[in-house]
Amino acid sequence: MLVVEDVADLRDFYAILLREEGYDVACACDGSDALRWLSWRPDVILLDLMMPVMNGYEFYAKMREIPGDHPPVIVVSAVAPMRAELPGIHATLPKPFEFSQLLSRVATAVTHGPTPSAAAF
């Protein structure tokens, strides 16, 4: 699982809790950093939208340009995106949220599996 969050305390908090649930977690501080982690082939990406350097929208668009299947993406953000802005997004989770809500969406995303690249649509 890849956690993409610019706020270090939140990023660390998500990672600790998800690791306690048995997930293998890597972290990125922005979209540019997250692109480098894609070769790791995470099962799920938790994506904040408002980040410096490369925001979540830009990261998502660039990821979908890469040929092949992509991990399900769960948008975790205080900004509520419209699904039309992020075609193929697996789920959204508005901040603040209960950790049980995150775990439920992650479990569903892991079961769902990868989605095809934008070129396949």
What residues fall within each predicted segment?
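Conserved acidic carboxylate
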Residues: 5
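Hydrophobic/aromatic residues positioned on beta-strands within the core alpha/beta folds
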Residues: 76-77
